[in-house]
Amino acid sequence: MQLANLLVKGYFPEELLPPFTTEDLPSVLPKVLPDLDELDPISGNKKRIITKSIAYSIPKIKGYRRNLGIPHPLHYIRLANTIVENWGDILTHCSQSFVTMSPITTKATSARSILKPSFKNTVRKKIIRSTGYRYLLKVDIAKFYSSIYTHSIPWALHTKDVAKQHRKRNTHFGNALDEDSRKLQDGQTVGLPIGPDTSRIISEIILVAIDKEMKSRLGYVQGVRVVDDYHLYFKTHGDLEKGRAVIHKALKDYELELNQNKELLLELPEVIENEWFSEIREFKFRNRWNYQRTDIITFFDTVITYAKKFPDELVLTYAMSKLRFTVFNVKNWKILQSLMLNALLIEPKILPYVAQNLIGYYKKGFNINESAIKDALEQFIIYHSDLSNDFEISRALWILKSLKIEISE
């Protein structure tokens, strides 16, 4: 892992607008790194500096919100540098999980410093690993990133007994990660900023330790874990109940709790693909403009129906992402544009895909309906301004700016 990668590709949450980048940040490293201990004292009598992360609100499904965190550059550099200096030991620790599908893997061509979990690979592993098992336990951790106890970082890396005996920064690098994580969160011991890849790395450190603890207590762990989302397989109901108790205890040891609203006990085989996913994935748009127009209307009717039937699923988000792969006839652009703008009222999360389509067809020279876009997005902005919804406001303004549409005063 290179420090520049964590700064350029892993600092800002991916949900931020394209104009916000950290591409120039590595240029300050020659000046900052030699004086890092002066700028951010970690020893001696100098006063310690702490900073707060900036909150950026994004939508979740069913109207819920999530606050992403953008740390102060100095303390992000400090934490990222500590991670890079100990990258080999971190990789060794994180390689010990046999269930994770969200390893801290890097790739030079990736848009992020840490690769996202592969959905296709996860589905394949679920099928293979569930073979011969009768029961499935689905669990995830309640408010995971915001409830991580930073003192548990050295526990995960060095064991709790060792960490409590040696608490100073320079004795174990887990203590340094603990201290650096607190500095960018106003000195708090609970919570990591959601969005930066440093939080992904630290969360995986803790979760791998939990995976190891479960295996130690059960003798085996069969299943998959995607970040904090577990699918665990058992042969008997007794084994399932034992596994359930063990994971509760393992999480409690790290000051974490299960999300009881999402805990499910199911008999296998499991339905791998929801009906909406399969139907939308296989949907094809015909080339002739009149047939294609019918297909567009059918597609949106189908998607809206499924979105209302499965309000807890990302139906609209997946559907809008699929539109990227079709070149629509210019005669159908007006109706497609209207249907996309209407869909925003149901699910604001689709804004990036709506933006991609609107801006993409605008650059291709399509005759977009500026007045309709202006009216729809201005009303959208007014509505979300009253709610202080950062994501919706900034994305809608970005679309208008990219399309060179002036907003009303």
Residue spans of the language-model regions?
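Conserved two-metal-ion catalytic palm core of "right-hand" nucleic acid polymerases
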Residues: M1-H172, A176-P196
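Short aromatic/hydrophobic-glycine micro-motifs
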Residues: Y11, G219-Y220, L256
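Short, surface-exposed helix-loop/turn micro-motifs enriched in polar/charged residues
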Residues: N67, P71, Q222-V224, E257
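Hydrophobic, Leu/Ile/Phe/Ala-enriched alpha-helical segments that form helix-helix packing faces
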Residues: L79-I90, L157, I210-M214, L218, ...
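Short flexible/disordered coil segments
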Residues: P103-S118, H158, H248, D253-L256, ...
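Conserved polymerase palm-domain catalytic core
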Residues: R124-V227, Y233-E241, N290-E409
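Polymerase palm active-site segment centered on the conserved acidic dipeptide of motif C
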Residues: H237-T298, T302-T305
